[in-house]
Amino acid sequence: MPQVDPELFDRGQFQAELALKASPIAAFKKAIRMAGEVLDKRFREGREIRRLIEDRAWFVDNILQQAWNQFDWGNPDGIALVAVGGYGRGELHPYSDIDLLILLDAAEHEQYRDAIERFLTLLWDIGLEVGQSVRTVDECAEQARADLTVITNLMESRTIAGPEPLRQRMLDATSTAHMWPSKEFFLAKRAELKARHHKYNDTEYNLEPNVKGGPGGLRDIQTVLWVARRQYGTLNLHALAGEDFLLESENELLASSQAFLWRVRYALHMLAGRAEDRLLFDHQRSIATLLGFNDENPKRAIEQFMQQYYRVVMSISQLCDLIIQHFEEVILADDDSGTTQPLNARFRLHDGYIEAVHPNVFRRTPFAMLEIFVLMAQHPEIKGVRADTVRLLREHRHLIDDKFRNDIRNTSLFIELFKCEIGIHRNLRRMNRYGILGRYLPEFGLIVGQMQHDLFHIYTVDAHTLNLIKHLRKLQYTPVSEKFPLASKLMGRLPKPELIYLAGLYHDIGKGRQGDHSELGAVDAHAFCARHQLPAWDSRLIVWLVLNHLVMSTTAQRKDLSDPQVINDFALHVGDETRLDYLYVLTVADINATNPSLWNSWRASLLRQLYTETKRALRRGLENPLDREEQIRQTQSAALDILVREGTDPDDVEQLWSQLGDDYFLKHNAADVAWHSDAILQQPADSGPLVLIKETTQREFEGGTQIFIYAPDQHDFFAVTVAAMAQLNLNIHDARIITSSSQFTLDTYIVLDNDGGSIGDNPQRVKQIRDGLTEALRTPEDYPAIIQRRVPRQLKHFDFPPQVTILNDAQRPVTILEITAPDRPGLLARIGRIFLEFDISLQNAKIATLGERVEDVFFITDADNQPLSDPQLCSRLQEAIIQQLQAGQASEASPSRMTF
């Protein structure tokens, strides 16, 4: 800390100002304000961050000393003002806690009561928010013995005012000789660290990470130092290196990483104007700019900043894990040296952990850097890697060069890992954590810590990739196999499961580069297969899966699966059942590894439908596709059988069906046709809208809730319906719009509740939905087309211009309207309003929300049920939609939209 810094605090000038004023408050406030401005200015100028936070602590020391000296403390040897916690370390960020201990010599402190109260009142009046406790030395010992937080705070203390011997007595009373011996303290701190990490989902890669408390954050470094302090009396990284627990290179890496996080935290406090340790979307762009991350594309600048952030916290996490494991081996070691068991000439087991038999193993036999992970997969009883061996791995990973990568021993070992029955994901994670995977596969190293600035991808690319492999592995075990029965069944019968793991490893490896990441990844995958001398069939399948890993989900979400041509085109693209099986399993794992909230019953049913229909097409033969007329005949025949068995007059059925048109029978299966027909025929004339609600299935993973509406057609039907569903908190995922020749509309919506589940067998909820829709459709003129609702905080930070594409379908008499836009409440209702204004008829819709963006597809016609053929009309429609959506983006209190 500085001894003198007159720009920050001039003691003589301050005391002169105090002498001129009747009240000291104004002088204190002025000094605090000016010091804050000076320090913030220095931060923006790029001053060294450690100096800044120490300077702030030094300034607060001076202010507290001046405040303390305003009062008569009587016997000054019996009371001291002590800084504890982070302030005790001499580290203060703009809004850090200023934790104070007023330490007393004896319990009889009545003589100090008035001065203490007035001192604390003065601190409050001058705007210095402190956390304070008033304790005797004995009380400190009593509370520290019972509370881990108290002993931790007291270990980091400095005397600000009063006698230093008093603090030394407190330190003696709370030393390991009296409480919290190093072993007990270590166990408690290790448990505390694990619980804290679990609070943040045990990952460094949260979208809005906590700089202080999250895994790899500042608290991890502090935990290491607390344990070292209790064991060795060491309180800084440099001293820890002197105890041989840190190499000098590791000390430098930890120090630079800590400095980076300090700068981020300082900027957070400065921008938020309060104590804020969460790196919220609200601040990421401003901090990226403040720290010098610049790019023509602001989104890219944020991604660059966050990638450095994630790499820093990963480095901290790795090193702190290493040090804590080293502590564990030293502090918890028994008197004997532990049991050892040889594994081979290079490795042995030591108390269940694998270790190198000598320090030169990796230098003499570099292939052992891959062998160690294969051994752990082959021996699942191995608990992990000894700390010294982890350090050896880190020290020798520079030996992984092109010669190493092309050595057949190494390529064989890497492929062998993927053929192990268990431990693939666990050991790939270890390889990534120790920096081996990114060295062996440089293309993988590029995606480490790479985050995409959106709400759709909640993990970095490397974490998502390893999560995908984890999900593939879990498909073989209950209860995951029960949740994903088809994927689990297919996974169990894949001829070579190692190929899907390798495809998963490469599927997103092209992210972050210019160009289509699927194409880039396919090129990398081809090179990988060649280098590892995989058979031609294996290589072709891996490359094809990487190139096409998005095709199945895109088809299921954006195409009309009721159209036989869509199924036939997809079957032609896939080519055979083996590829279909691999692609389906990879798609399910990819979605669940991207964002667990993306997987819902409706998405599951779409993929399963596409898989089943494609499999039928492949077995039927691609040269014999099912045509529309054949599908309609099959549906009508099966539905009529159901109705006749239930006693329905076939003549009545034929009369009704004659009004419906071909599209209706293409878009619905026989069971739904029978269900609709029976209800319509029983509906009394002029009884108002018919609203039917049923589950698509009884099993949770099988689909959503189907709402069928039959009513006289009216121009604002779609707009009113979607607005009503918004008010009922329903999320629309699919819409099928049919208008009969008798001008009745037969609309089917697949919906889920806000939590992503189907409505279930809740009679009250079903009645609420039926009554709400019936009332809205009976009196549409009284129903608001748009319902006001605020935009969620996170969505506000992801803004981009809406994209609207209009094109005619060469194979069907419809126009396809594709909309990509920021997710905002009221989007569907706004689109419905545009359709009303342009006299547009909606035939079908596919609704999808991917994080903060919507990707909706509408199949539309003009009022005569013909595709839109006027280019000027299409241009005006496109412009109107964009203007309407931009108006929705500009509004803080935006209307409600059905989200996905």
From Swiss-Prot:
Regulation: Uridylyltransferase (UTase) activity is inhibited by glutamine, while glutamine activates uridylyl-removing (UR) activity.
GO MF annotations in UniProt: [protein-PII] uridylyltransferase activity; phosphoric diester hydrolase activity
Catalysed reaction equations from the record: [protein-PII]-L-tyrosine + UTP = [protein-PII]-uridylyl-L-tyrosine + diphosphate; [protein-PII]-uridylyl-L-tyrosine + H2O = [protein-PII]-L-tyrosine + UMP + H(+)
Highest rank taxon of the organism: Bacteria
Spans annotated as Uridylyltransferase: 1-342
The UniProt record lists the keyword Nucleotidyltransferase: yes
EC code: 2.7.7.59, 3.1.4.-
Biological process terms in GO annotation: regulation of nitrogen utilization
Notes concerning its domains: Has four distinct domains: an N-terminal nucleotidyltransferase (NT) domain responsible for UTase activity, a central HD domain that encodes UR activity, and two C-terminal ACT domains that seem to have a role in glutamine sensing.
Annotated function: Modifies, by uridylylation and deuridylylation, the PII regulatory proteins (GlnB and homologs), in response to the nitrogen status of the cell that GlnD senses through the glutamine level. Under low glutamine levels, catalyzes the conversion of the PII proteins and UTP to PII-UMP and PPi, while under higher glutamine levels, GlnD hydrolyzes PII-UMP to PII and UMP (deuridylylation). Thus, controls uridylylation state and activity of the PII proteins, and plays an important role in the regulation of nitrogen assimilation and metabolism.
Family of this protein: Belongs to the GlnD family.
Record's protein name: Bifunctional uridylyltransferase/uridylyl-removing enzyme
